[in-house]
Design a protein with these regions (language model features):
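Peripheral membrane interaction modules
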Residues: 2-21, 35, 76-161, 165, ...
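Long, intrinsically disordered low-complexity tandem-repeat regions enriched in serine/threonine/proline
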Residues: 9, 14, 26, 31-94
Length: 427
Protein backbone atom coordinates (compact mmCIF):
# COMPACT_ATOMS: atom_id res chain seq x y z
CA UNK A 1 0.00 0.00 0.00
CA UNK A 2 2.74 2.34 0.93
CA UNK A 3 4.65 1.22 -2.09
CA UNK A 4 1.74 2.09 -4.38
CA UNK A 5 1.43 5.48 -2.79
CA UNK A 6 5.08 6.13 -3.32
CA UNK A 7 4.80 5.00 -6.97
CA UNK A 8 1.94 7.33 -7.59
CA UNK A 9 3.79 10.05 -5.82
CA UNK A 10 6.78 9.39 -8.04
CA UNK A 11 4.64 9.69 -11.12
CA UNK A 12 3.31 12.97 -9.85
CA UNK A 13 6.82 14.18 -9.22
CA UNK A 14 7.94 13.13 -12.68
CA UNK A 15 5.17 14.93 -14.49
CA UNK A 16 6.56 18.40 -13.97
CA UNK A 17 9.72 17.34 -15.76
CA UNK A 18 7.74 16.61 -18.91
CA UNK A 19 5.44 19.63 -18.81
CA UNK A 20 8.08 22.20 -19.65
CA UNK A 21 9.08 20.12 -22.64
CA UNK A 22 5.48 19.96 -23.84
CA UNK A 23 5.13 23.68 -23.18
CA UNK A 24 8.21 24.45 -25.38
CA UNK A 25 6.64 22.70 -28.39
CA UNK A 26 3.44 24.71 -28.08
CA UNK A 27 5.36 28.02 -27.83
CA UNK A 28 7.45 27.25 -30.94
CA UNK A 29 4.37 26.52 -33.04
CA UNK A 30 2.75 29.70 -31.87
CA UNK A 31 5.90 31.62 -32.76
CA UNK A 32 5.89 30.18 -36.28
CA UNK A 33 2.26 31.13 -36.72
CA UNK A 34 2.95 34.64 -35.50
CA UNK A 35 5.84 34.96 -38.00
CA UNK A 36 3.60 33.84 -40.86
CA UNK A 37 0.87 36.29 -39.83
CA UNK A 38 3.39 39.13 -39.59
CA UNK A 39 4.80 38.26 -43.02
CA UNK A 40 1.35 38.14 -44.61
CA UNK A 41 0.49 41.42 -42.93
CA UNK A 42 3.67 43.02 -44.28
CA UNK A 43 2.96 41.68 -47.79
CA UNK A 44 -0.59 43.03 -47.63
CA UNK A 45 0.64 46.44 -46.52
CA UNK A 46 3.18 46.49 -49.39
CA UNK A 47 0.45 45.59 -51.89
CA UNK A 48 -1.77 48.33 -50.48
CA UNK A 49 1.11 50.82 -50.69
CA UNK A 50 1.70 49.83 -54.33
CA UNK A 51 -1.95 50.15 -55.26
CA UNK A 52 -2.49 53.42 -53.38
CA UNK A 53 -0.62 55.73 -55.85
CA UNK A 54 -2.46 54.17 -58.80
CA UNK A 55 -5.77 54.68 -57.04
CA UNK A 56 -4.87 58.28 -56.22
CA UNK A 57 -3.89 58.96 -59.87
CA UNK A 58 -7.17 57.50 -61.10
CA UNK A 59 -9.08 59.60 -58.58
CA UNK A 60 -7.17 62.74 -59.66
CA UNK A 61 -7.96 62.06 -63.33
CA UNK A 62 -11.60 61.47 -62.47
CA UNK A 63 -11.65 64.74 -60.52
CA UNK A 64 -10.08 66.64 -63.44
CA UNK A 65 -12.52 65.11 -65.95
CA UNK A 66 -15.42 65.89 -63.65
CA UNK A 67 -14.21 69.50 -63.26
CA UNK A 68 -13.96 69.99 -67.04
CA UNK A 69 -17.42 68.52 -67.56
CA UNK A 70 -18.79 70.72 -64.77
CA UNK A 71 -17.21 73.80 -66.39
CA UNK A 72 -18.74 72.90 -69.77
CA UNK A 73 -22.13 72.22 -68.18
CA UNK A 74 -21.86 75.52 -66.35
CA UNK A 75 -21.20 77.30 -69.65
CA UNK A 76 -24.13 75.45 -71.20
CA UNK A 77 -26.37 76.54 -68.32
CA UNK A 78 -25.30 80.16 -68.79
CA UNK A 79 -26.44 80.20 -72.43
CA UNK A 80 -29.42 77.89 -72.02
CA UNK A 81 -31.89 80.80 -72.13
CA UNK A 82 -30.91 81.53 -75.75
CA UNK A 83 -31.12 77.87 -76.84
CA UNK A 84 -27.65 78.28 -78.32
CA UNK A 85 -26.12 75.03 -77.15
CA UNK A 86 -29.07 72.74 -76.48
CA UNK A 87 -28.36 69.32 -77.93
CA UNK A 88 -24.62 69.90 -78.30
CA UNK A 89 -22.16 67.47 -76.77
CA UNK A 90 -19.23 68.51 -74.60
CA UNK A 91 -16.94 67.63 -77.52
CA UNK A 92 -18.85 69.91 -79.91
CA UNK A 93 -18.74 72.80 -77.46
CA UNK A 94 -15.01 72.30 -76.95
CA UNK A 95 -14.35 72.24 -80.71
CA UNK A 96 -16.39 75.42 -81.23
CA UNK A 97 -14.51 77.18 -78.46
CA UNK A 98 -11.15 76.08 -79.87
CA UNK A 99 -12.03 77.22 -83.42
CA UNK A 100 -13.08 80.69 -82.29
CA UNK A 101 -9.91 80.97 -80.20
CA UNK A 102 -7.82 79.91 -83.22
CA UNK A 103 -9.56 82.47 -85.46
CA UNK A 104 -8.93 85.26 -82.98
CA UNK A 105 -5.29 84.23 -82.55
CA UNK A 106 -4.77 84.13 -86.35
CA UNK A 107 -6.26 87.61 -86.66
CA UNK A 108 -4.06 88.88 -83.82
CA UNK A 109 -0.97 87.46 -85.55
CA UNK A 110 -2.03 89.12 -88.82
CA UNK A 111 -2.48 92.42 -87.00
CA UNK A 112 0.95 92.22 -85.34
CA UNK A 113 2.55 91.41 -88.70
CA UNK A 114 0.80 94.39 -90.33
CA UNK A 115 1.89 96.75 -87.55
CA UNK A 116 5.51 95.60 -87.71
CA UNK A 117 5.61 96.02 -91.50
CA UNK A 118 3.25 98.90 -92.32
CA UNK A 119 3.60 101.00 -89.19
CA UNK A 120 7.15 102.16 -89.99
CA UNK A 121 6.05 102.92 -93.58
CA UNK A 122 3.78 105.72 -92.39
CA UNK A 123 0.48 103.83 -92.52
CA UNK A 124 -0.07 104.82 -88.88
CA UNK A 125 -2.24 102.49 -86.77
CA UNK A 126 -3.96 99.24 -87.75
CA UNK A 127 -7.51 100.53 -87.29
CA UNK A 128 -6.92 103.87 -89.05
CA UNK A 129 -9.21 104.42 -92.02
CA UNK A 130 -8.22 105.90 -95.38
CA UNK A 131 -8.20 109.69 -95.38
CA UNK A 132 -8.09 110.07 -99.17
CA UNK A 133 -11.21 111.68 -100.57
CA UNK A 134 -13.25 110.24 -103.43
CA UNK A 135 -13.35 113.84 -104.77
CA UNK A 136 -9.60 114.46 -104.59
CA UNK A 137 -9.36 115.71 -108.19
CA UNK A 138 -12.96 116.93 -108.59
CA UNK A 139 -12.11 120.64 -108.34
CA UNK A 140 -8.95 120.56 -110.46
CA UNK A 141 -9.13 122.16 -113.89
CA UNK A 142 -7.81 121.66 -116.44
CA UNK A 143 -7.38 117.88 -116.41
CA UNK A 144 -4.56 116.97 -113.96
CA UNK A 145 -1.36 115.21 -114.95
CA UNK A 146 -1.81 111.46 -115.35
CA UNK A 147 1.33 110.93 -113.25
CA UNK A 148 -0.70 111.68 -110.13
CA UNK A 149 -4.27 111.05 -111.32
CA UNK A 150 -5.10 107.92 -113.28
CA UNK A 151 -7.80 105.86 -114.90
CA UNK A 152 -7.39 102.29 -113.62
CA UNK A 153 -9.03 98.99 -112.75
CA UNK A 154 -11.08 98.99 -109.54
CA UNK A 155 -13.28 96.68 -107.47
CA UNK A 156 -16.96 97.54 -107.21
CA UNK A 157 -18.45 96.23 -103.95
CA UNK A 158 -21.91 94.91 -104.79
CA UNK A 159 -23.09 93.17 -101.61
CA UNK A 160 -22.18 91.24 -98.47
CA UNK A 161 -24.66 88.47 -97.72
CA UNK A 162 -25.05 86.21 -94.70
CA UNK A 163 -25.93 83.12 -96.72
CA UNK A 164 -25.90 80.51 -93.94
CA UNK A 165 -26.29 80.44 -90.15
CA UNK A 166 -24.98 77.46 -88.17
CA UNK A 167 -23.81 76.37 -84.73
CA UNK A 168 -27.03 77.14 -82.87
CA UNK A 169 -27.50 80.71 -84.12
CA UNK A 170 -30.98 81.57 -85.32
CA UNK A 171 -32.34 84.51 -87.29
CA UNK A 172 -32.96 87.31 -86.61
CA UNK A 173 -29.46 88.25 -85.41
CA UNK A 174 -28.12 91.57 -84.14
CA UNK A 175 -24.73 91.81 -85.83
CA UNK A 176 -21.97 94.34 -85.17
CA UNK A 177 -18.32 94.71 -86.12
CA UNK A 178 -16.26 95.67 -89.16
CA UNK A 179 -15.74 94.58 -92.76
CA UNK A 180 -12.96 96.52 -94.52
CA UNK A 181 -10.72 96.47 -97.59
CA UNK A 182 -7.09 97.55 -97.98
CA UNK A 183 -5.46 98.42 -101.30
CA UNK A 184 -1.99 99.54 -102.35
CA UNK A 185 -2.90 103.26 -102.42
CA UNK A 186 -2.38 103.76 -98.68
CA UNK A 187 -2.86 100.33 -97.03
CA UNK A 188 -5.37 101.82 -94.60
CA UNK A 189 -8.82 100.46 -93.89
CA UNK A 190 -11.54 101.36 -96.37
CA UNK A 191 -14.69 100.56 -94.39
CA UNK A 192 -17.47 98.62 -96.11
CA UNK A 193 -19.51 97.78 -93.00
CA UNK A 194 -19.15 99.26 -89.51
CA UNK A 195 -21.70 98.95 -86.72
CA UNK A 196 -21.03 99.40 -83.02
CA UNK A 197 -22.42 97.19 -80.29
CA UNK A 198 -24.91 99.85 -79.21
CA UNK A 199 -26.27 100.10 -82.78
CA UNK A 200 -26.07 96.64 -84.38
CA UNK A 201 -27.80 95.70 -87.61
CA UNK A 202 -30.75 93.34 -87.35
CA UNK A 203 -30.29 90.56 -89.92
CA UNK A 204 -33.55 88.86 -90.91
CA UNK A 205 -34.54 85.91 -93.05
CA UNK A 206 -36.07 88.05 -95.82
CA UNK A 207 -33.10 90.45 -95.92
CA UNK A 208 -29.79 88.72 -95.03
CA UNK A 209 -27.58 91.50 -96.47
CA UNK A 210 -25.26 93.71 -94.46
CA UNK A 211 -26.09 97.41 -94.80
CA UNK A 212 -22.95 98.81 -96.43
CA UNK A 213 -21.55 102.26 -95.73
CA UNK A 214 -18.63 102.15 -98.16
CA UNK A 215 -16.16 102.14 -99.69
CA UNK A 216 -15.40 105.81 -99.01
CA UNK A 217 -13.24 105.94 -102.17
CA UNK A 218 -12.67 103.61 -105.12
CA UNK A 219 -10.71 100.41 -104.38
CA UNK A 220 -7.72 100.10 -106.69
CA UNK A 221 -7.03 96.49 -107.76
CA UNK A 222 -3.74 96.69 -109.62
CA UNK A 223 -2.38 94.62 -106.72
CA UNK A 224 -4.14 92.12 -104.45
CA UNK A 225 -6.85 93.64 -102.27
CA UNK A 226 -7.04 92.42 -98.69
CA UNK A 227 -10.41 92.00 -96.98
CA UNK A 228 -10.79 91.92 -93.19
CA UNK A 229 -13.90 90.75 -91.41
CA UNK A 230 -14.65 90.80 -87.67
CA UNK A 231 -18.28 90.24 -86.71
CA UNK A 232 -20.01 89.48 -83.42
CA UNK A 233 -23.59 88.85 -82.33
CA UNK A 234 -25.14 91.09 -79.67
CA UNK A 235 -27.19 88.97 -77.22
CA UNK A 236 -28.17 91.25 -74.36
CA UNK A 237 -25.43 91.42 -71.74
CA UNK A 238 -21.88 91.94 -72.99
CA UNK A 239 -20.79 88.68 -71.36
CA UNK A 240 -23.32 86.80 -73.48
CA UNK A 241 -22.17 88.17 -76.85
CA UNK A 242 -20.73 85.59 -79.25
CA UNK A 243 -18.06 85.89 -81.91
CA UNK A 244 -19.50 85.14 -85.36
CA UNK A 245 -16.37 85.19 -87.54
CA UNK A 246 -12.87 86.70 -87.74
CA UNK A 247 -10.96 86.30 -90.99
CA UNK A 248 -8.77 87.92 -93.65
CA UNK A 249 -8.53 87.15 -97.36
CA UNK A 250 -6.40 88.40 -100.23
CA UNK A 251 -8.21 88.79 -103.56
CA UNK A 252 -6.81 89.37 -107.00
CA UNK A 253 -8.27 88.54 -110.40
CA UNK A 254 -7.27 89.65 -113.88
CA UNK A 255 -10.58 89.03 -115.60
CA UNK A 256 -13.37 91.64 -115.43
CA UNK A 257 -16.80 90.61 -114.23
CA UNK A 258 -18.60 89.57 -111.05
CA UNK A 259 -16.79 87.40 -108.49
CA UNK A 260 -17.75 85.96 -105.09
CA UNK A 261 -15.41 85.75 -102.10
CA UNK A 262 -16.51 83.28 -99.40
CA UNK A 263 -15.81 83.37 -95.66
CA UNK A 264 -16.98 80.33 -93.67
CA UNK A 265 -16.58 78.74 -90.24
CA UNK A 266 -18.66 76.65 -87.80
CA UNK A 267 -21.17 79.44 -87.28
CA UNK A 268 -21.82 81.12 -90.61
CA UNK A 269 -21.09 81.50 -94.29
CA UNK A 270 -20.67 84.99 -95.73
CA UNK A 271 -20.44 85.86 -99.43
CA UNK A 272 -18.78 89.10 -100.54
CA UNK A 273 -19.86 89.90 -104.10
CA UNK A 274 -17.51 92.17 -106.08
CA UNK A 275 -17.10 93.25 -109.69
CA UNK A 276 -13.82 94.05 -111.38
CA UNK A 277 -14.12 97.06 -113.69
CA UNK A 278 -11.42 98.28 -116.08
CA UNK A 279 -10.36 101.85 -116.91
CA UNK A 280 -12.52 103.53 -114.30
CA UNK A 281 -12.89 106.85 -112.53
CA UNK A 282 -14.83 107.36 -109.28
CA UNK A 283 -18.24 108.96 -108.86
CA UNK A 284 -19.60 110.37 -105.61
CA UNK A 285 -23.38 110.71 -105.43
CA UNK A 286 -23.43 113.94 -103.43
CA UNK A 287 -27.20 114.10 -103.12
CA UNK A 288 -30.55 112.82 -104.28
CA UNK A 289 -33.12 115.50 -103.47
CA UNK A 290 -36.87 115.71 -103.78
CA UNK A 291 -37.38 119.06 -105.53
CA UNK A 292 -41.16 118.84 -105.70
CA UNK A 293 -43.50 116.30 -104.17
CA UNK A 294 -46.23 114.88 -106.37
CA UNK A 295 -49.92 114.83 -105.63
CA UNK A 296 -50.01 111.06 -106.15
CA UNK A 297 -46.54 110.17 -104.91
CA UNK A 298 -44.51 111.24 -101.91
CA UNK A 299 -41.00 109.91 -102.49
CA UNK A 300 -39.59 110.62 -99.04
CA UNK A 301 -41.96 108.30 -97.16
CA UNK A 302 -40.56 104.93 -98.27
CA UNK A 303 -38.02 104.50 -101.03
CA UNK A 304 -35.06 102.60 -102.42
CA UNK A 305 -32.11 104.15 -104.28
CA UNK A 306 -29.68 102.11 -106.36
CA UNK A 307 -27.31 102.58 -109.27
CA UNK A 308 -25.50 100.67 -111.97
CA UNK A 309 -22.90 101.51 -114.58
CA UNK A 310 -22.74 100.92 -118.31
CA UNK A 311 -19.65 100.82 -120.49
CA UNK A 312 -19.45 101.23 -124.25
CA UNK A 313 -17.41 99.42 -126.86
CA UNK A 314 -16.29 100.98 -130.12
CA UNK A 315 -17.34 98.82 -133.07
CA UNK A 316 -17.36 99.26 -136.82
CA UNK A 317 -20.90 98.87 -138.15
CA UNK A 318 -21.55 99.38 -141.88
CA UNK A 319 -18.08 100.83 -142.21
CA UNK A 320 -18.68 103.46 -139.54
CA UNK A 321 -17.30 103.57 -135.97
CA UNK A 322 -20.16 103.12 -133.52
CA UNK A 323 -20.24 102.91 -129.72
CA UNK A 324 -22.37 100.02 -128.47
CA UNK A 325 -23.48 99.67 -124.84
CA UNK A 326 -22.19 96.61 -123.04
CA UNK A 327 -24.19 94.72 -120.43
CA UNK A 328 -24.80 96.88 -117.34
CA UNK A 329 -22.79 96.22 -114.22
CA UNK A 330 -24.18 94.78 -111.02
CA UNK A 331 -26.59 96.81 -108.90
CA UNK A 332 -25.21 98.90 -106.05
CA UNK A 333 -27.75 99.73 -103.32
CA UNK A 334 -27.32 103.27 -101.96
CA UNK A 335 -30.42 103.36 -99.74
CA UNK A 336 -32.89 100.66 -98.77
CA UNK A 337 -35.92 101.85 -96.80
CA UNK A 338 -38.66 99.77 -98.33
CA UNK A 339 -40.67 99.51 -95.13
CA UNK A 340 -39.39 102.43 -93.03
CA UNK A 341 -40.34 106.08 -93.46
CA UNK A 342 -37.63 108.69 -93.98
CA UNK A 343 -36.73 110.74 -90.89
CA UNK A 344 -38.35 114.15 -90.69
CA UNK A 345 -36.35 117.34 -91.20
CA UNK A 346 -34.34 116.01 -94.14
CA UNK A 347 -35.41 118.97 -96.32
CA UNK A 348 -36.01 116.68 -99.25
CA UNK A 349 -32.55 115.08 -99.21
CA UNK A 350 -32.51 111.29 -99.11
CA UNK A 351 -30.08 109.98 -96.48
CA UNK A 352 -27.92 107.62 -98.56
CA UNK A 353 -26.01 104.92 -96.66
CA UNK A 354 -23.22 104.78 -99.27
CA UNK A 355 -22.22 107.19 -102.03
CA UNK A 356 -19.06 106.15 -103.92
CA UNK A 357 -19.08 103.93 -107.01
CA UNK A 358 -16.65 103.17 -109.83
CA UNK A 359 -17.64 104.08 -113.40
CA UNK A 360 -15.77 103.23 -116.57
CA UNK A 361 -14.35 106.45 -118.01
CA UNK A 362 -16.23 106.11 -121.31
CA UNK A 363 -19.38 104.83 -119.66
CA UNK A 364 -22.37 106.18 -117.79
CA UNK A 365 -23.95 106.06 -114.35
CA UNK A 366 -27.63 105.18 -113.96
CA UNK A 367 -29.40 106.20 -110.73
CA UNK A 368 -32.76 104.54 -109.94
CA UNK A 369 -35.28 105.65 -107.29
CA UNK A 370 -38.22 103.41 -106.35
CA UNK A 371 -41.09 104.26 -104.03
CA UNK A 372 -42.82 101.55 -102.05
CA UNK A 373 -45.99 100.83 -100.13
CA UNK A 374 -46.03 100.05 -96.41
CA UNK A 375 -45.85 96.34 -97.30
CA UNK A 376 -42.70 96.88 -99.37
CA UNK A 377 -44.25 96.57 -102.83
CA UNK A 378 -42.79 98.89 -105.49
CA UNK A 379 -45.45 101.31 -106.70
CA UNK A 380 -43.42 103.83 -108.74
CA UNK A 381 -39.95 104.13 -110.27
CA UNK A 382 -37.82 106.73 -112.00
CA UNK A 383 -34.22 106.87 -113.22
CA UNK A 384 -31.62 109.15 -114.76
CA UNK A 385 -28.33 108.47 -116.60
CA UNK A 386 -25.22 110.66 -116.44
CA UNK A 387 -22.21 110.40 -118.75
CA UNK A 388 -18.93 109.94 -116.86
CA UNK A 389 -16.45 112.83 -116.55
CA UNK A 390 -12.80 113.06 -115.45
CA UNK A 391 -13.54 115.83 -112.93
CA UNK A 392 -16.22 118.36 -112.03
CA UNK A 393 -19.92 117.91 -111.22
CA UNK A 394 -23.03 116.70 -113.03
CA UNK A 395 -26.59 117.50 -112.03
CA UNK A 396 -29.85 116.28 -113.54
CA UNK A 397 -33.54 116.20 -112.71
CA UNK A 398 -35.96 113.33 -113.28
CA UNK A 399 -39.42 112.18 -112.26
CA UNK A 400 -40.80 109.39 -110.11
CA UNK A 401 -44.46 109.36 -111.07
CA UNK A 402 -45.45 113.02 -110.60
CA UNK A 403 -42.71 113.84 -108.06
CA UNK A 404 -39.60 115.69 -109.25
CA UNK A 405 -36.11 114.72 -108.02
CA UNK A 406 -32.58 116.00 -108.57
CA UNK A 407 -29.30 114.07 -108.41
CA UNK A 408 -25.84 115.65 -108.06
CA UNK A 409 -22.67 113.66 -108.83
CA UNK A 410 -19.00 114.58 -108.36
CA UNK A 411 -16.39 113.03 -110.65
CA UNK A 412 -12.72 112.38 -109.97
CA UNK A 413 -9.76 110.49 -111.36
CA UNK A 414 -8.04 107.96 -109.09
CA UNK A 415 -5.08 108.43 -106.77
CA UNK A 416 -2.44 105.82 -107.57
CA UNK A 417 -0.32 106.28 -104.42
CA UNK A 418 -0.81 108.39 -101.31
CA UNK A 419 2.91 109.21 -101.17
CA UNK A 420 2.76 110.75 -104.67
CA UNK A 421 0.17 113.36 -103.74
CA UNK A 422 1.91 114.16 -100.45
CA UNK A 423 5.26 114.70 -102.15
CA UNK A 424 6.36 118.39 -102.13
CA UNK A 425 5.92 120.13 -105.46
CA UNK A 426 9.13 121.55 -106.94
CA UNK A 427 8.97 125.27 -107.75
Amino acid sequence: MDFEMEEESGKQQQLPRFLPHGSDIHSSDQHMIDLKVDKQKQMTEVEIDKQKPMTEVKMDKQKQTTKVEMDIRKQMAEVEMDDMDIGKSVQELTMEKEEIAAEEEDFSCYRRAWESRRGPEGCSFFEDTTQLSSMHFTHLTPKPSLDDAIVAETLQILSIKLTEIKGGFKLPLSVYGVVAARDSVDNNRNLLFAHSRIAPQRIRQHNPYLRLIGPSRAILCRDPVRFEIQLKVERGAVSRDRALISATRDFYVRHPGVHTICFENRFCKIELCVERLVETIQATICSVRVVKQGTRQRVESRCRVSCSTTSYSRKIIDGKPTYVANAPSGEVVLLDRLKKPMPSGSEGYLDLSRRVVSVEHEGSLKVVVQTCSSSGDIIAEGHVSLASEYFGFSQKRFNVDDAELEVTVAWSLLVVDKDDILRPVAV
